[in-house]
């Protein structure tokens, strides 16, 4: 059977550059003057970024982000830098960074060339794959079985773009249903309003784990996309990007990364060979 039950389980380039703007932003100067850093984050992307205990942001990406924020605080001479957390969807978070409303973005955002037109990115923080979640009691064993069915997907995401390409080429009778919220998609899948939900695999596992009965859901083994996660940054700000990547390198080279992975992704077992290689490749020498 080409799927596995989720209930049995209960994470660009080294220097994403982009074109240099005529007047490069001085985000570090802005943060130093305000003594505040504005950080856009995903409020419902367990286990990467979500609203946790005491209504505070939590997750794998948030832990990395806090290390980055501490490094930025040191760089601007504000070790107790105040953090203003700004929740939003992926398009909203990218817009916040592009317009200057947010100085940094932390979530489960994939780096793409299309997005590099408006923002820069840090080194990679995670690598995932797009997958398909179904109900465990369904008869679907492969993507081909979903021809003529309804698949939910978050609108304006990299998964949506890849899913549409697959549908147009291989599943011409399938209907792609755009949704604005992950919980809405899970509810639609559980009720039978849709037959499947496409998203990043680790996030799908996290969403199922939040339901009353995770064993009701399963993942097809097929992968539909490659998702390289990174932190979105203001475009053209090399000084900020330097501090962000230095902070990430320090975490990757220390025991901290094992603790962070264990805390948020430990239920899935040890990091994959690909993820381990990513930590090594993005550990930039001084």
Question: Which ranges hold each PLM region?
Answer:
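Extracytoplasmic small-molecule ligand-binding "clamshell" domains
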Residues: 22-105
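Extended ligand-binding regions for polar small-molecule ligands
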Residues: 22, 59, 63-71, 137-140, ...
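Bilobed "Venus flytrap"/periplasmic-binding protein-like clamshell domains
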Residues: 38-47, 57-74, 110, 128-182, ...
